[in-house]
C-alpha cells in the first residue's frame, strides 16, 4: 500500500489515537483532514502537524450528526480532491455503570458517536472512495473490548458499541471484496489517551459537558497505557500489510482464547443435548 501523496480523513483527530494516527500519516507523506468535535484541540493538532511537509485541513464536526458529516466530506473533497483513507476513530465512554441505570440520552450519545459515527463515515465517504478507483483503506477503531467484556471495568455499554464495530468492519470487508479499498478494525488495549474525559465532549443536545464520576482514577489508569504514537505506527504497518484485525498488545490473546473456549463449550453442550445427554 502506497501512502505518500494520498489523503486521509481522520475522525477523533484532535488527540489520543486519532492524533497518533495523524502523526504516522504525516511522517509517511499523507495529506490529512482532521475531524473532531473539539475546535480548540483541533487547531492545536493541526498546528503541530504543520511541521511536517504535508497539507492539513481541520473540520469541527459531531460525527453522530449525519448531515454534518456530509458537509464535512464535501468540504474535505473541495480542499483535497480524492480521499483515499478513512479512519473512523472518534469514540466516547461512560465508564462503569450498570446497563439498567443508563438514561435514553446516555444510550443516544454513546451509540451515536461510537456506532452511528462510524456508519456515517462509511455511508458518506466509502462511495466516494470507490468511485475514483484508487487504492485506499477504511480503518474502524473498535477496542479489545469489542472482543470480550472486561469483568473488572464493567463498561458494558462501551463494549456493546465496540462489538458492533467489529461486526460492522467484518461486513464492510466482505462488501469491499474485489475493490481497490480494504477494510480493517483496530482493537487496542490500554492506550494513554483522554478517553476518560469523554464527558467534556458531550454535545448540548444530549445534555452538554459534565463531570464523569471516577474520571480521575480512569486517567491515572490510562496514563500507564501505550502511547498514541506507537498505536499510529502500528496501524499504518498493519494497513500496509493488508491486515484485518489490528492489535496493539499481546497480553489480551489469553482473554480472547478463554472467551472462545466458553463459546466452544456451548457447542459441546448442544452436541451432548442432541445426543440424548439431557439433564432434565
Name each model-derived stretch:
Residues 143:
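Residue(s) in the substrate-gating loop at a strand-loop-helix junction
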Residues 122, 161:
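Active-site helix of classical SDR
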Residues 178-246:
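SDR active-site lid
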Residues 97-99, 106-108:
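Substrate-binding pocket helix/loop in short-chain dehydrogenase/reductase
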Residues 28-44:
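Conserved glycine-rich Rossmann-like NAD(P)H-binding loop of the short-chain dehydrogenase/reductase
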Residues 2-33:
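Canonical Rossmann dinucleotide-binding motif of NAD(H)/NADP(H)-dependent dehydrogenases/reductases
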